[in-house]
């Protein structure tokens, strides 16, 4: 029997330090995964501290609920349900929010999840296997134009149209139902290859992001987090590809600038609205040692912002 897939938490010490944890504070881990960040946060909290950990993956929630720590509340929901779940728990504000974005190693390494072209498995890709369409189900009905749009917008795939046509041609002879089948279709349709990268990498990324609505979830949770952060509370986001990082970077940049007002408004400087966030340091990437030990960390980017007293 093979060992269970292991998840190596990226930027573990750096992310926990960036949260500037108050021992008695309330914190949110937006993606519990296998609990690396959550355990490190709990280690910094005293008996009055509290951690709310979200995850869409039922298996991640099983791991979280098995931890014998009364300070931890595990929530089986996407992090876009942030405000709703805080209301349910009777929490108005929190002291820090950590978002470790993207897919976890166990999800990639467990063949049955259908997220990787390294295995032959049902073409699923859902983070929450208890709800929603699988990629195979979506591909069965999607038009060439729809498939092209997803591959282009979420995978930045140059050969999106050629791949979409190849998928449509292949499904005429039967459903595109397995990861290997899809990978072979893409491999034949891609005319040039990027060094060190499988031709299906961008397509698999695009379909996974789309089927899980990852970018939409991120765009929803960022403003919700700022609304609920106490002044001085930190928002820490770790992204793993340019699409995620672009959203985080733009949001933090925009929220760290004063609101745009008509220039002729009769307001004194002290009366002008203040920005809601203050950027903390520069973006941070894993060091050479971490990348050598965990090659999947190489694309990670961490950004940090602190809630000001600016009006919500």
From Swiss-Prot:
Task: Please list the residues that bind S-adenosyl-L-methionine.
Answer: 35-37, 55, 79, 100, 107
Write out the GO biological process terms.
rRNA base methylation
**Region spans: Disordered:** 279-312
Which Gene Ontology CC terms are recorded?
A: cytoplasm
Primary residence: cytoplasm
Q: What is its EC number?
A: 2.1.1.199
The superkingdom of the source organism is Bacteria
**Protein keywords:** Cytoplasm, Methyltransferase, rRNA processing, S-adenosyl-L-methionine, Transferase
The record ties this protein, via SUPFAM superfamilies, to: Putative methyltransferase TM0872, insert domain, S-adenosyl-L-methionine-dependent methyltransferases
Q: Name one Pfam family in it.
A: Methyltransf_5
The protein's GO terms of the molecular function aspect are: rRNA (cytosine-N4-)-methyltransferase activity
Q: Where is the signal peptide?
A: none
- Please name the top-level EC class of this enzyme: transferase
Does this entry carry the keyword Lipoprotein?
Answer: no
Cellular location(s): Cytoplasm
**Is Methyltransferase included in the keywords of this UniProt record?**
yes
Q: What is the reaction catalyzed?
A: cytidine(1402) in 16S rRNA + S-adenosyl-L-methionine = N(4)-methylcytidine(1402) in 16S rRNA + S-adenosyl-L-homocysteine + H(+)
Give the family this protein belongs to, as stated in its UniProt record.
Belongs to the methyltransferase superfamily. RsmH family.
| Known role | Specifically methylates the N4 position of cytidine in position 1402 (C1402) of 16S rRNA.
Q: What is this protein called?
A: Ribosomal RNA small subunit methyltransferase H
Q: List the source organism.
A: Aromatoleum aromaticum (strain DSM 19018 / LMG 30748 / EbN1) (Azoarcus sp. (strain EbN1))
Write the lineage as a comma-separated list.
Bacteria, Pseudomonadati, Pseudomonadota, Betaproteobacteria, Rhodocyclales
């Amino acid at each position: 029997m093979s060992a269970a897939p292991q998840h190596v938490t990226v930027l573990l010490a750096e992310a926990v330090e960036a949260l500037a944890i108050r021992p008695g504070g309330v914190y949110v881990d937006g993606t519990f995964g296998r609990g690396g960040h959550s355990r490190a946060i709990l280690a910094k909290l005293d008996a009055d501290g509290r951690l709310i950990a979200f995850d869409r993956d039922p298996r991640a929630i099983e791991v979280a609920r098995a931890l014998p720590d009364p300070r931890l509340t595990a929530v089986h929901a996407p992090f876009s349900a942030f405000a709703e779940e805080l209301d349910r728990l009777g929490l108005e504000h929190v002291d820090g929010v950590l978002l470790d974005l993207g897919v976890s190693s166990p999800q990639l390494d467990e063949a049955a999840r259908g997220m990787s072209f390294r295995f032959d498995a049902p073409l699923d890709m859902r983070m929450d296997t208890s709800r929603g369409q699988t990629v195979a189900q979506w591909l069965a009905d999607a038009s060439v134009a729809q498939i092209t749009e997803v591959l282009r917008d979420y995978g930045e795939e140059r050969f999106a149209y050629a791949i979409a046509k190849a998928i449509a041609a292949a499904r005429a002879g039967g459903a595109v139902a397995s990861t290997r089948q899809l990978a072979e279709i893409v491999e034949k349709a891609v005319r040039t290859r990027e060094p060190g990268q499988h031709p299906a990498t961008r397509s698999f990324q695009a379909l996974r992001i789309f089927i899980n609505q990852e970018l939409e979830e991120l765009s929803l949770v960022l403003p919700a987090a700022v609304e609920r952060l106490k002044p001085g509370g930190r928002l820490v986001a770790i992204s793993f590809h340019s699409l995620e990082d672009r959203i985080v970077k733009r949001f933090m940049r925009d929220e760290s600038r004063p609101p745009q007002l008509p220039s002729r408004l009769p307001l004194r400087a002290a009366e002008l609205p203040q920005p809601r966030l203050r950027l903390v340091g520069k973006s941070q990437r894993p060091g050479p040692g971490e990348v050598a030990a965990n090659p999947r960390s190489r694309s990670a980017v961490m950004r940090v912002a602190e809630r000001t007293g600016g009006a919500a």
